[in-house]
Amino acid sequence: MTTGSRIVLHVDMDSFFASIEVRRDPSLAGRPVIVGADPKGGAGRGVVSTCSYEARRYGVHSGMPISRAFDLCPHGVYLPVDRPFYASVSVEIMALLSRHAGRIEQVSIDEAYLDVSDAGSFPAAGALAAAIKREVREETGLTCSVGVAPGKAVAKIASDFQKPDGLTIVRPDEVAGFLASLPVGRIPGIGKKTGEDLRQAGILTVGDLARRDVQEVIARLGRSGVRVHHLARGIDDGEVQGREGCKSISRETTFEADTADPPVLAGTLAELADDVAETLRADNLRCRTVTVKVRYRGFQTHTRSRTLPRFTSDPETIRRAASGLLLPFLNGEPVRLIGVRLSMLEGGCTRQASIDEFFS
């Protein structure tokens, strides 16, 4: 179990894109809002970027093929992704968070880690988290969920524990107990298929995983097995990475169910490419190298990169490069995770480097 004085907050905006759309048009409040591809004009291709909690009651979720979402919720409100507007709101939120921590690590457009060790105690950090939630609501009209823990991984799990608009505090001596009864799939890096494989092996909870020998876990999960086994035993040493440098910008997503569907994979990758391109432009940066990452069902992870002839921040150029890199991965093998990274950056950097796990 982690000991020491580190206190980490994970702040995760609730249904970010959909919530912004409801803020922009209050008549959408209480209705199933789905942000993503056009289910009709796009011939049913593409995926759901995010959706409101009302839409989730019909089984709709992020990463789902938009055609499936329309089957489940034909009466939903389907809206296109307005990435520049969402990015501008993200800048507001990150500026707000920066007022409360000297070290902040933004890991996506709608989530960040804060090192609040200076708070001095977990009760004080909990009060700070409550104040942050209140400020976010008052200043942006949006809600967020916050996890407070000794390390990043547990803080992230905790932020998802009472969504939406939740606050969960896990003190150092509570980490192992907090994790023990959770389904094994709640550990970051364990997807739906691997979770099912573990359950068939009798590993149903995080506690079950903690009791297994680390070599068995490595055999099942590969090189991520050590990290996962440590976390299952309450060892969470993840530190918040600050603004010491901006070496790359990354975005990735894990599918709810593994998919080999080329339109779904291509549509998801295009969304991710647009996301990182928007972040690049917002930070006044340009890139030369585009990398696509694919993780298959068996946790085999592969990357392909292309160095462009010149520095660029053009979304279409980045999207085309990413799409070309994806083609060799469309081999019929089910994909668990897909991601895009931009590197070889030049220009002013106002954000943090992405967490190493994105492209490890």
From Swiss-Prot:
<dbReference type="InterPro" id="IPR024728">
    <property type="entry name" value="PolY_HhH_motif"/>
</dbReference>
<protein>
    <recommendedName>
        <fullName>DNA polymerase IV</fullName>
        <ecNumber>2.7.7.7</ecNumber>
    </recommendedName>
</protein>
<keyword id="KW-0808">Transferase</keyword>
<keyword id="KW-0227">DNA damage</keyword>
<dbReference type="InterPro" id="IPR050116">
    <property type="entry name" value="DNA_polymerase-Y"/>
</dbReference>
<feature type="binding site">
    <location>
        <position position="12"/>
    </location>
    <ligand>
        <name>Mg(2+)</name>
    </ligand>
</feature>
<feature type="domain" description="UmuC">
    <location>
        <begin position="8"/>
        <end position="191"/>
    </location>
</feature>
<comment type="function">
    <text>Poorly processive, error-prone DNA polymerase involved in untargeted mutagenesis. Copies undamaged DNA at stalled replication forks, which arise in vivo from mismatched or misaligned primer ends. These misaligned primers can be extended by PolIV. Exhibits no 3'-5' exonuclease (proofreading) activity. May be involved in translesional synthesis.</text>
</comment>
<dbReference type="InterPro" id="IPR001126">
    <property type="entry name" value="UmuC"/>
</dbReference>
<keyword id="KW-0235">DNA replication</keyword>
<dbReference type="InterPro" id="IPR043128">
    <property type="entry name" value="Rev_trsase/Diguanyl_cyclase"/>
</dbReference>
<comment type="subunit">
    <text>Monomer.</text>
</comment>
<dbReference type="InterPro" id="IPR043502">
    <property type="entry name" value="DNA/RNA_pol_sf"/>
</dbReference>
<feature type="binding site">
    <location>
        <position position="110"/>
    </location>
    <ligand>
        <name>Mg(2+)</name>
    </ligand>
</feature>
<dbReference type="GO" id="GO:0006261">
    <property type="term" value="P:DNA-templated DNA replication"/>
</dbReference>
<keyword id="KW-0548">Nucleotidyltransferase</keyword>
<dbReference type="InterPro" id="IPR022880">
    <property type="entry name" value="DNApol_IV"/>
</dbReference>
<dbReference type="Pfam" id="PF11798">
    <property type="entry name" value="IMS_HHH"/>
</dbReference>
<dbReference type="InterPro" id="IPR017961">
    <property type="entry name" value="DNA_pol_Y-fam_little_finger"/>
</dbReference>
<dbReference type="Pfam" id="PF00817">
    <property type="entry name" value="IMS"/>
</dbReference>
<keyword id="KW-0234">DNA repair</keyword>
<feature type="site" description="Substrate discrimination">
    <location>
        <position position="17"/>
    </location>
</feature>
<dbReference type="GO" id="GO:0005737">
    <property type="term" value="C:cytoplasm"/>
</dbReference>
<keyword id="KW-0515">Mutator protein</keyword>
<dbReference type="GO" id="GO:0042276">
    <property type="term" value="P:error-prone translesion synthesis"/>
</dbReference>
<keyword id="KW-0479">Metal-binding</keyword>
<keyword id="KW-0238">DNA-binding</keyword>
<dbReference type="GO" id="GO:0000287">
    <property type="term" value="F:magnesium ion binding"/>
</dbReference>
<dbReference type="InterPro" id="IPR036775">
    <property type="entry name" value="DNA_pol_Y-fam_lit_finger_sf"/>
</dbReference>
<keyword id="KW-0239">DNA-directed DNA polymerase</keyword>
<feature type="active site">
    <location>
        <position position="111"/>
    </location>
</feature>
<comment type="similarity">
    <text>Belongs to the DNA polymerase type-Y family.</text>
</comment>
<dbReference type="GO" id="GO:0003887">
    <property type="term" value="F:DNA-directed DNA polymerase activity"/>
</dbReference>
<keyword id="KW-0963">Cytoplasm</keyword>
<dbReference type="GO" id="GO:0003684">
    <property type="term" value="F:damaged DNA binding"/>
</dbReference>
<keyword id="KW-0460">Magnesium</keyword>
<dbReference type="Pfam" id="PF11799">
    <property type="entry name" value="IMS_C"/>
</dbReference>
